[in-house]
Amino acid sequence: DMAQKRLDDAMKLGATRVINAKEKDVLKEVEAFTNGVGIEKVFETAGSPVTIAQTPYLVKKGGTITLVGMAADPKVKFNFGQIMAKEARIESVFRYRNLYAKAISAVANGIDIGMVATHEFDFEHIQEAYEAAINDKENVVKAVIKL
């Protein structure tokens, strides 16, 4: 990702390594800490054309790339030759599809969503909620609108 708060939160939630793609050369970082082997599971969450295009070079042979981030321009350069040579798999996630029931169950069972639901807004302030989510991506992970 490119938002440091999100990366910090990922570490608190159990990630073993994260890389801020705005600050570091992701390819060099991954090569160094995997001794050139690559990553078993690559999750691209930023939705940046640059970070999406890097994923074939990050995944290890037989690994999996999961594309979560949505690029503003749907046309992104992607090296399928690298994917084929590594026999890697590509998965995509359309954000929240089929997750509502699981999310409701998790919250009902006591999971703490405080790190994810970082901001709450009353319905009357819906415009403010959208503006915060769009303009303050560094701090707003998810904005909750109370009905």
Predicted feature residues:
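Helix-to-beta-strand junctions that scaffold the AdoMet/dcAdoMet cofactor pocket
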Residues: 59-61
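Adenosine-nucleotide cofactor-binding segment
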Residues: 1-54
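Rossmann-fold NAD(P)-binding glycine/threonine-rich loop
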Residues: 69-87, 103-105
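C-terminal hydrophobic helical "lid"/dimerization subdomain
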Residues: 53-57, 97, 101-147
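Glycine-centered, small-residue-biased loops immediately flanking beta-strands
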Residues: 63-64, 88
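Residues in the short beta-alpha loop(s) of Rossmann-like NAD(P)-binding domains
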Residues: 3, 71, 96
